[in-house]
């Protein structure tokens, strides 16, 4: 009888990718995935530590799992093995056992390949096992190739870690130093997902445009080199990558938007603030003028490119004038979509030790103002698409039986009513007939 594996994933696309790899890793050991936590023999929470709220979600979920375990015990059933993985595991380590002693395993992002051994030890009644080693090479070398098809769009991790040490961010401490997979590993995985039906690949990394992987004849490939190499794969229609840092947007990568049709005209390029003072305090290593220059060069290379970004409001020391600089940057760049958050002090980061923290009510006010501007820009961009014809990659069924959903080159969701379901997995011309804040509606041509 097969054993059941339940994985709940929090946070970034890298965590989504890691969860798939953990699933693939445990399958040969008899663990089949389930979406029903109540029947699981192993429960893995793949966690996020980027903000306090995200981290506390882990403990809330663990509390619910404890109640489930208690119910199973009363019914005479065996308890599930509980695993905390991801960035909360890396950041908090033994503290997780202190707060939630019923957790069996704590494993960091670079140590997933040891899960089968760790789980087997728990089966043999060992408890409170922890593995937080930072050995990126071992992770990439030992995690399995894809077993379950990812679908029409696939994630491939090509780079992990961060050397930037922004003063608000825990990633260098939870994911380690920057490390790039070798080109052959990435290419082989890309061939695998395309042969399984993927039309689009998203390359992932904490600083993906810092990629510098070893290729044939020991040549070092940049991200631009890697994208050009992958673009040669037959039946691969679209390439994307995330997340990027402005200082790693080199000329070769910018120019590629004008020469490689498979590279989609959409870029997520976090800036975090529009104030030079705050950018310096964040240790972002660039100023607003540098960011504007990148945007201008991207638009010269690909006039229809659409930008996305991340913003943090209420970083320590942020004045009204600093916040106005952020609003000014947003209005000058004009984004297609964005993510914005209140600053959340993370333990162990320089920002958390500053004495000039911004009151919560001011952070909330600024976030509301910023989000109103960003939502207005997003709606304006979506509305500008009405009447146009776009190539849409249909990748999933809608909520209703008579609906399918795809995405444009600009990452907008497009809903089609009464479609031919054979369109799933294909790229089709769609006339956009209606726009809302978060999606488009269209008709097949």
Swiss-Prot record:
<feature type="binding site">
    <location>
        <position position="12"/>
    </location>
    <ligand>
        <name>[4Fe-4S] cluster 1</name>
    </ligand>
</feature>
<feature type="binding site">
    <location>
        <position position="162"/>
    </location>
    <ligand>
        <name>[4Fe-4S] cluster 2</name>
    </ligand>
</feature>
<dbReference type="InterPro" id="IPR006463">
    <property type="entry name" value="MiaB_methiolase"/>
</dbReference>
<keyword id="KW-0408">Iron</keyword>
<keyword id="KW-0411">Iron-sulfur</keyword>
<dbReference type="InterPro" id="IPR002792">
    <property type="entry name" value="TRAM_dom"/>
</dbReference>
<keyword id="KW-0808">Transferase</keyword>
<dbReference type="GO" id="GO:0046872">
    <property type="term" value="F:metal ion binding"/>
</dbReference>
<protein>
    <recommendedName>
        <fullName>tRNA-2-methylthio-N(6)-dimethylallyladenosine synthase</fullName>
        <ecNumber>2.8.4.3</ecNumber>
    </recommendedName>
</protein>
<keyword id="KW-0949">S-adenosyl-L-methionine</keyword>
<dbReference type="InterPro" id="IPR038135">
    <property type="entry name" value="Methylthiotransferase_N_sf"/>
</dbReference>
<keyword id="KW-0479">Metal-binding</keyword>
<dbReference type="InterPro" id="IPR007197">
    <property type="entry name" value="rSAM"/>
</dbReference>
<keyword id="KW-0819">tRNA processing</keyword>
<feature type="binding site">
    <location>
        <position position="169"/>
    </location>
    <ligand>
        <name>[4Fe-4S] cluster 2</name>
    </ligand>
</feature>
<feature type="binding site">
    <location>
        <position position="87"/>
    </location>
    <ligand>
        <name>[4Fe-4S] cluster 1</name>
    </ligand>
</feature>
<dbReference type="InterPro" id="IPR020612">
    <property type="entry name" value="Methylthiotransferase_CS"/>
</dbReference>
<dbReference type="GO" id="GO:0005829">
    <property type="term" value="C:cytosol"/>
</dbReference>
<dbReference type="InterPro" id="IPR006638">
    <property type="entry name" value="Elp3/MiaA/NifB-like_rSAM"/>
</dbReference>
<dbReference type="InterPro" id="IPR023404">
    <property type="entry name" value="rSAM_horseshoe"/>
</dbReference>
<dbReference type="GO" id="GO:0035597">
    <property type="term" value="F:N6-isopentenyladenosine methylthiotransferase activity"/>
</dbReference>
<feature type="domain" description="TRAM">
    <location>
        <begin position="383"/>
        <end position="445"/>
    </location>
</feature>
<keyword id="KW-0004">4Fe-4S</keyword>
<dbReference type="Pfam" id="PF04055">
    <property type="entry name" value="Radical_SAM"/>
</dbReference>
<dbReference type="GO" id="GO:0051539">
    <property type="term" value="F:4 iron, 4 sulfur cluster binding"/>
</dbReference>
<comment type="subunit">
    <text>Monomer.</text>
</comment>
<feature type="domain" description="Radical SAM core">
    <location>
        <begin position="148"/>
        <end position="380"/>
    </location>
</feature>
<feature type="binding site">
    <location>
        <position position="166"/>
    </location>
    <ligand>
        <name>[4Fe-4S] cluster 2</name>
    </ligand>
</feature>
<feature type="domain" description="MTTase N-terminal">
    <location>
        <begin position="3"/>
        <end position="124"/>
    </location>
</feature>
<dbReference type="Pfam" id="PF00919">
    <property type="entry name" value="UPF0004"/>
</dbReference>
<comment type="function">
    <text>Catalyzes the methylthiolation of N6-(dimethylallyl)adenosine (i(6)A), leading to the formation of 2-methylthio-N6-(dimethylallyl)adenosine (ms(2)i(6)A) at position 37 in tRNAs that read codons beginning with uridine.</text>
</comment>
<keyword id="KW-0963">Cytoplasm</keyword>
<comment type="similarity">
    <text>Belongs to the methylthiotransferase family. MiaB subfamily.</text>
</comment>
<dbReference type="Pfam" id="PF01938">
    <property type="entry name" value="TRAM"/>
</dbReference>
<dbReference type="InterPro" id="IPR005839">
    <property type="entry name" value="Methylthiotransferase"/>
</dbReference>
<feature type="binding site">
    <location>
        <position position="48"/>
    </location>
    <ligand>
        <name>[4Fe-4S] cluster 1</name>
    </ligand>
</feature>
<dbReference type="InterPro" id="IPR013848">
    <property type="entry name" value="Methylthiotransferase_N"/>
</dbReference>
């Amino acid at each position: 009888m097969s054993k059941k594996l339940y994985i709940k994933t929090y946070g970034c696309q890298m965590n989504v990718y890691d969860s798939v790899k953990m699933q693939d890793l445990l399958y040969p050991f008899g663990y089949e995935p389930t979406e029903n936590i109540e029947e699981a023999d192993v429960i893995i929470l793949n966690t996020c530590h980027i903000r306090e709220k995200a981290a506390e979600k882990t403990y809330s979920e663990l509390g619910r799992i404890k109640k489930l375990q208690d119910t199973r015990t009363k019914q005479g059933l065996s308890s599930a093995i509980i695993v905390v993985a991801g960035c909360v595991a890396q950041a908090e380590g033994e503290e997780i056992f202190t707060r939630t002693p019923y957790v069996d395993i704590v494993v960091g992002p670079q140590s997933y390949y040891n899960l089968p051994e760790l789980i087997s030890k728990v089966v043999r009644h060992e408890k409170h096992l922890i593995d937080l080693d930072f050995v990126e090479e071992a992770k990439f070398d030992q995690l399995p190739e894809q077993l379950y098809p990812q679908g029409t769009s696939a994630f491939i991790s090509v780079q992990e870690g961060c050397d930037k040490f922004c003063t608000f961010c825990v990633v260098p401490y939870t994911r380690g130093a920057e490390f790039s997979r070798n080109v052959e590993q990435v290419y082989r995985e890309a061939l695998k997902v395309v042969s399984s039906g993927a039309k689009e690949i998203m390359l992932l990394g904490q600083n993906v445009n810092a990629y510098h992987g070893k290729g044939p004849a020991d040549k070092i490939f940049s991200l631009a080199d890697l994208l050009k190499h992958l673009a040669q794969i037959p039946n691969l229609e679209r390439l994307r990558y995330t997340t990027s840092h402005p200082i790693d947007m080199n000329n070769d990568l910018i120019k590629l938007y004008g020469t490689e049709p498979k590279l989609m005209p959409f870029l997520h390029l976090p800036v975090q603030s529009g104030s030079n003072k705050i950018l310096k305090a964040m240790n972002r290593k660039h100023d607003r003028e540098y960011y504007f220059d990148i945007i201008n060069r991207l638009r010269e290379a690909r006039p229809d490119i659409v930008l996305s970004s991340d913003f943090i409001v209420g970083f320590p020391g942020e004045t009204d004038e600093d916040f106005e600089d952020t609003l000014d940057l947003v209005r000058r760049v004009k984004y297609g979509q964005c993510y914005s958050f209140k600053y959340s002090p993370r333990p162990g980061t320089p920002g958390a030790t500053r004495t000039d923290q911004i009151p919560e009510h001011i952070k909330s006010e600024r976030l509301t103002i910023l989000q109103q501007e960003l939502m207005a820009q997003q709606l304006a961009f979506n509305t500008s698409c009405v009447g146009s014809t776009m190539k849409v990659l249909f990748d999933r069924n809608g909520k209703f039986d008579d609906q399918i959903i795809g995405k444009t080159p600009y990452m907008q969701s497009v809903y089609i009513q009464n479609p031919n379901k054979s369109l799933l997995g294909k790229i089709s011309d769609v006339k956009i007939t209606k726009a809302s804040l978060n999606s488009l509606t269209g008709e097949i041509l």
